[in-house]
Amino acid sequence: MEKNVTCDSMTRNDKGWEVQFNYDTYVFDLDGTLLSTLGDLAASCNHALRANGMPERTIDEVRRFVGNGVKKLMERAIPGGLDNPLFEKTFADFRQHYMHHNLDTTCPYPGVMEMLESLRSRGKKVAVVSNKFYAATQAL
């Protein structure tokens, strides 16, 4: 096998495939792309559900509920969703808990920090987008 094989913007070498993009700016999603946040989201979700007398959700259920922001997560997790009379209180409890516990188990995926540092060291601009509420993204 050849030492280096290229395919569009990827190179395969002894270490595996390496992406060889050359953009000025790179934009990444936060949850589930750069950071593994599922554990803290599930813990805060279950804290809020428990505090309001609702059944807790498994990690797999929360994984399926994630997407389109934390309000949508809680809409899916709370029995009856937005129609539940305790929705707003439960959602507020979730937000309050998450603000204090969003770094309990959250961590970057393997290789993320090295990739970001590599981009920065090459003078590239890096941005993060998230549909998570602003205050929660700042600590992360």
Please give the residue ranges for each predicted region.
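Polybasic, lysine-rich low-complexity intrinsically disordered segments
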Residues: K3-N4, N13
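Active-site neighborhood of HAD-like aspartate-dependent phosphohydrolases
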Residues: W17-R64
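Short, acidic loop-to-helix structural element flanking the phosphoryl-transfer center
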Residues: F21-N22, H100-V128, Y134-A139
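Helix-loop "lid/cap" segments that line or gate small-molecule binding pockets
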Residues: A48-L49, G69-D83, L140
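Short alpha-helical
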Residues: D40, G69-K72, E114, A135-A136
